[in-house]
């Protein structure tokens, strides 16, 4: 190669000038930059090394794992946020988000509460296999489902279903322990009284503190049950809430709860933009949702050609993210409910079904990106990770 040929490349002099500037500034700024980066990494770590300090049985189908740091530090969090556990189960590397149910004013541990899901890969593993002293890996705290004093009213209407109670438990505990000037109206839907998580604790707090209002709603009550029955309907809400103008609304639970309760809340006159939501995973019966192609059966199998990798098979009723994980193709993910956008992939050819309400950015729609956790193959696909 001819000596000095690189000097003839376009932009060579600009690169040389940039290097000189970087060397000049780098020496004086490096210490401050390094310190700032270390502090940021401490507050927002990519991974946390955690140990299981205790396991608390909440109901016959749910337990709380008390997690402590193996590095003697846990990042702060806001009541309502979650961590994602990174796991390998049966050779499948996957992740699951779990809301932190402990209060944020203590920094010694994170409590996460797991409810058993029928045929659930992760929930059954955590409930059946994990023991005190075991090690787990997680993300740092994440999520936008929290109280913001700049935009939210001091009176909170919280609608929960199943394990969707966990972020509200963190909020309630913080309000009580820190003496915050907020009120909570908690409507908690469960199939039976035996399925209610934290029921005794919430009932005690509601009896003791005037700013905590607890309304359990039981779908299949026992004969002796005297509370609200059925589902969390507009009528159930109206019986408790005098008006809506001075309240903020939060919904957390499975997709079915959100699909049912959102119209009930809107019927009260609450604008959609004033209702915060936190969904737990993809719908279990996605083929029953509006817009699902009538000619596609849940067990229909399609070929997914992952660019620069071998093709895989994916069932229509299984999210693209789950199919990739089962075939040992790891895709970054946190929320698994279509909100964080970390698992986005580009559809090069083929079609996927996405349920209404998934917050896909306009630019992603324009260039063919989807959230793989909430995208279901309805034809053969070619994708780019």
List where the protein language model places each region.
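Iron-sulfur (Fe-S) cluster-binding modules
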Residues: 1-44, 267, 272, 378, ...
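Phosphate-handling active-site elements
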Residues: 177-185, 350-359
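Ferredoxin-reductase
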Residues: 34-135, 139, 153-154, 190-192, ...
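A short, compositionally biased
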Residues: 80-81, 295-302, 339-341, 377
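C-terminal accessory/binding modules appended to enzymatic or scaffolding proteins
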Residues: 298-332, 336-339, 348
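Local cysteine-cluster metal-coordination motifs and their immediate loop/turn environment
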Residues: 325, 329-353, 364-378
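FNR/FR-type flavoprotein reductase catalytic core
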Residues: 1-7, 11-14, 124-305
């Amino acid at each position: 190669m001819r000596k000095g040929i690189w000097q003839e490349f376009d932009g060579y002099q600009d690169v040389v000038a940039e290097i000189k500037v970087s060397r000049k500034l780098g020496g004086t700024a490096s210490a401050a930059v390094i310190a700032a980066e270390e502090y940021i990494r401490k507050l927002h770590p990519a991974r946390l090394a955690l140990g299981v300090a205790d396991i608390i049985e909440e109901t016959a189908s749910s337990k709380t794992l008390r997690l402590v740091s193996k590095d003697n530090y846990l990042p702060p969090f806001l009541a309502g946020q979650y961590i994602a556990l990174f796991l390998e189960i049966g050779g499948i590397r996957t992740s699951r988000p779990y809301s932190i149910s402990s209060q944020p004013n203590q920094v010694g541990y994170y409590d996460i509460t797991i409810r058993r899901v029928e045929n659930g890969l992760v929930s059954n593993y955590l409930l059946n296999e994990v023991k005190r002293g075991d090690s787990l890996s997680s993300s740092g705290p994440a999520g936008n489902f929290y109280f913001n004093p700049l935009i939210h009213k001091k009176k909170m209407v919280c609608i929960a279903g199943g394990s969707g109670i966990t972020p509200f438990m963190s909020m309630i505990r913080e309000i009580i322990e820190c003496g915050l000037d907020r009120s909570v109206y908690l409507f908690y839907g469960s199939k039976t009284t035996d399925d209610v998580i934290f029921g005794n604790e919430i009932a005690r707090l509601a009896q003791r503190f005037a700013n905590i209002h607890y309304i359990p709603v039981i779908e299949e009550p026992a004969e002796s049950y005297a509370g609200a029955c059925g589902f969390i309907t507009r009528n159930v809400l109206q019986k408790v809430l005098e008006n809506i103008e001075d309240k903020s609304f939060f919904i957390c639970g499975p997709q079915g709860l959100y699909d049912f309760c959102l119209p009930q809340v809107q019927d009260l006159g609450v604008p959609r933009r004033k209702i915060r939501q936190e969904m737990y995973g993809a719908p279990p019966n996605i083929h029953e949702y509006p817009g699902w192609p009538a000619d596609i059966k849940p067990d229909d199998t399609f070929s997914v050609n992952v660019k620069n990798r071998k093709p895989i098979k994916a069932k229509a009723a299984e999210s693209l993210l789950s199919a990739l994980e089962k075939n040992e193709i790891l895709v970054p993910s946190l929320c698994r409910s279509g909100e964080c956008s970390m698992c986005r992939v580009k559809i090069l050819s083929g079609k996927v079904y996405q349920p209404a309400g998934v917050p896909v950015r306009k630019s992603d729609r324009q260039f063919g990106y989807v959230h793989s956790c909430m995208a279901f193959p309805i034809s053969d696909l070619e994708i780019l990770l």
